[in-house]
Amino acid sequence: MRGQYTWKLGRPLPVLGGHSVAKHEIFEQYIKIYIERLTRTPSQTMLNLTIVDGFSGGGLYRRGSTEVDGSPLRLLRAIEGLEDVLKSTRAKGFDLRADFFFIDENLHHVEFLTDVLRQRGYAQRLGRDIFIRHALFEEACPDVLAHIKKKGTAQRSLFFLDQYGWSDVGLSLIRKILGSLRNPEVLLTFAVDALINFLSVKTAETQALLNIELDREDVRALTDLRGGEGWRYLIQNSLYRHIQNCTGARFYTPFFIHSAESRRSYWLLHLSNHRQARDEMGKLHWRLNNHFQHHGGAGFHALGFDPSKDLRQGMLTFMFDDDAMRRSEAAVLEQLPRMIHEANRASGGLLVEDLFASNCNDTPVTSDILRRQLAFLRDEGELSIVAPDGSGKPRSKNIGWGDRLVLPPERSLFSRLGW
């Protein structure tokens, strides 16, 4: 974590910014959702997991007049609380086998965190299931990947990469993580405004830009967008695509955290290869709506920016509040008929999973929003929902990923779905 927070034994604690509070809250809450998702089977008694904090810092901050736990302590505490609940509610108990890697390039940070963990009662676990590494994340990563692979075949792992800027984590390294493990997820902080301000032909061949695989032509193409209407949105949109393509992530959730302290925006990018992981992160943004924004529209294809359109129409900053929910539901209701009709013309219907998976990356829409609107269209007689076994679901509120959306044989004269 370069440039903002510093720790040293005997020195005052760094002051935690409001945007970092939001990130830490997301980290802790997502851990809880993640574990709950993977332990839904009542007979399950064990889960293997590795949690990696690639820019751990010293583990303690000051906010106002109080000490505040940093990400290492919050991650440890979240796992402990979840294991206690699982052990108390499962007849045969539960063993949550979580290993932790806390990595930082600054020796003072490592010494500070080690001291904090000892004071908090974790001394016996250091070197057993809590591993502290004094190294750059990229240097420590090969050993971490080897550890995860040895731990089991599922290779479930969460990488929290809370870098201060935008170039400390090479995109090739994220590509390696996502490509070499079976079930990894990456949460990456990315200082997009700082990158946009840095972009110029003069800086085109710096190592920082090479780390995120932007070459001279890429930089030139991005800087050429400057000056036109909505240029910042255009550059952000191009960077979305670039990061997804370079990391190989099938699913990503790009949302903004605004830093009042620096007056700049950061991305919190969730990268994974699993549809369910993406959906859960999207739902979490709706629940923790105080600090998060999405720059774009309300429905599907919300990040596909058209420079010919008036920026004031549909491209306003999107907050995760009640008004945003209403806008999302209205937009999805407007877009779904065309999407379903086109799929039915090409084939025998559209799987709910295919509909969501092929459209979820560029949208704040979650499966809950989608299912509510599908049920509405069905109840209006605009579509039929068919279960995997071929039976109809005329009234069921449970719309599954394997259900198929088909046009009914008869529709109203004013059908939204057309012919």
Regions found by a protein language model. Give the residues of each.
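Short amphipathic alpha-helix with an adjacent loop that forms part of the alpha/beta core around
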Residues: 140-153, 175
